[in-house]
């Protein structure tokens, strides 16, 4: 993947526009989870250190486009950045007709979704963004799969368009896991529905030596093997699709499971063979033998791609399967990459973040990259690198 990298450029004295992913949860005017801002800080600090005139922006939430709404302001992000940086930081609300930035100062441009035409990748808006800078830095992998004015359009018109360190690292890590993985390559796809992950399963079945399925997805595969899944979440209309995948790829389907008669945090768990699931029971986790089998597979892997838990890990009684799998990934010597909201929550819960080789910041973008789709922002950066 050939793109210009921000780290290859001299930014001294240049007006630098960084499109970061600062879309963080905010409650009562305070940032409640700072992971995305923390991930973006090194990029901002590097540009400031080089003596650039730095502007950074992002979307936050889903405001009505073209209207200012205090609820979706980047002000809480600005206050957070003021605490973390020694440089002056200020928020600018009206910037489309130009903004003055001093060297060593960080200007946060208000929520891009307050600008009409942002989501539609409007050309006039894109040109206005581009006129603000000498160098455009795309560093928001989480929105790279959307062609919008601040992620894609601006890059077509800016003098220079490059990938920020976060985006570059993300592309390198995903490339390493998917393009020429060290083998055996094991992929884990969890989640509730086969339908939402079908393309991912399809793509990975062609790359992975073993494809581990978990959650509601695994239930559809258990049904495909002719077992009764009781009241479990599964998709009857995709059983044939699961059967097809079972013939094209090595998919270890659970042999034992944990079940309950209701979907609740306090429901007691019963461990049993997949042959014995009753009509009034639902599968909420994989069993111990299945979890150990997966741990063994992961122990021998050289590359692991992890997207989704293998059970309802939010409920303590149905956490064990995901915990065993998570710890097996953490203990493995494989190159491991993890992505997706539930996966990140599991990594936090089991405290293994420092044992995963690379944690992806993108949800939808991560999945689309895995599916082999072209990410518009990345395609634009590749195009600009040729000029």
Swiss-Prot record:
Pathway(s) where this gene product acts: Carbohydrate degradation; glycolysis; pyruvate from D-glyceraldehyde 3-phosphate: step 2/5
Catalytic activity: (2R)-3-phosphoglycerate + ATP = (2R)-3-phospho-glyceroyl phosphate + ADP
Presence of the UniProt keyword Transferase in the record: yes
Broadest EC class assigned to this enzyme: transferase
Protein's UniProt keywords contain Transferase: yes
Residues given in the record as substrate binding sites: 21-23, 36, 59-62, 113, 146
Modified-residue entries (N6-acetyllysine), positions: 84
Places the protein is found: Cytoplasm
EC numbers, comma separated: 2.7.2.3
Residues spanning the membrane: none
GO molecular function: ADP binding; ATP binding; guanosine tetraphosphate binding; phosphoglycerate kinase activity
Swiss-Prot/TrEMBL GO biological process terms: gluconeogenesis; glycolytic process
GO cellular component assignments: cytosol
Keywords: Acetylation, ATP-binding, Cytoplasm, Glycolysis, Kinase, Nucleotide-binding, Transferase
Main subcellular localisation: cytoplasm
Domain of life: Bacteria
Residues noted as binding ATP in the record, renumbered to the chain: 197, 314, 340-343
Subunit structure: Monomer.
HAMAP family attached to this UniProt entry: Phosphoglyc_kinase
Family listed: Belongs to the phosphoglycerate kinase family.
Protein name: Phosphoglycerate kinase
Primary gene name: pgk
């Amino acid at each position: 993947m050939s793109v210009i990298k921000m780290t290859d450029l001299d930014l001294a004295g240049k007006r630098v526009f960084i499109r970061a992913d600062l879309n963080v949860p905010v409650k009562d005017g305070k940032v409640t989870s700072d992971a995305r801002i923390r991930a973006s800080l090194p990029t901002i600090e590097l540009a400031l250190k080089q003596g650039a005139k730095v502007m950074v922006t992002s979307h936050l939430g889903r405001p009505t486009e073209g209207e200012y709404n205090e609820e979706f302001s980047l002000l809480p992000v600005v206050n957070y950045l003021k605490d973390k940086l020694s440089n002056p930081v200020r928020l600018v609300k009206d910037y489309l007709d130009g903004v003055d930035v001093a060297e060593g100062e960080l200007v946060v441009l208000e929520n891009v979704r307050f600008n009409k035409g942002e989501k539609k990748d409007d050309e006039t808006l894109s040109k206005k963004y581009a006129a603000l800078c000498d160098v455009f830095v795309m560093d928001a992998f989480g929105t790279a799969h959307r062609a919008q004015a601040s992620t894609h359009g601006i890059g077509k018109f800016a003098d220079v368009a490059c990938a920020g360190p976060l985006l570059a690292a993300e592309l390198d890590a995903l490339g390493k896991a998917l393009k020429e993985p060290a083998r055996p390559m094991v992929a884990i796809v969890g989640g509730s529905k086969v339908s939402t992950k079908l393309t991912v399963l399809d793509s990975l079945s062609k790359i992975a030596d073993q494809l581990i399925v978990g959650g509601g997805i695994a239930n559809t595969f258990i049904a495909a093997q002719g077992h009764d899944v009781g009241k479990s979440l599964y998709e009857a209309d995709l059983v044939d699709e699961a059967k097809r995948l079972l013939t094209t790829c090595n998919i270890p389907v659970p042999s034992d499971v944990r079940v309950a008669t209701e979907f609740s945090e306090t429901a007691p768990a019963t461990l049993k063979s997949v042959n014995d699931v009753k009509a009034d029971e639902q599968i909420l986790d994989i069993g111990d033998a299945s979890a150990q089998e997966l741990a063994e597979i992961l122990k021998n892997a050289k590359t692991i791609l992890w997207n989704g838990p293998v059970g309802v890990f939010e409920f303590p009684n149905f956490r064990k399967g995901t915990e065993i799998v998570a710890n097996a990934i953490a203990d493995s010597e494989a190159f491991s990459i993890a992505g997706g909201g539930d996966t990140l929550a599991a990594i936090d819960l089991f405290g293994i973040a420092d044992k995963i080789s690379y944690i992806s910041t993108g949800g939808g973008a991560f999945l689309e990259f895995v599916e082999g789709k072209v990410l518009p922002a990345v395609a634009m950066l590749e195009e600009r690198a040729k000029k």
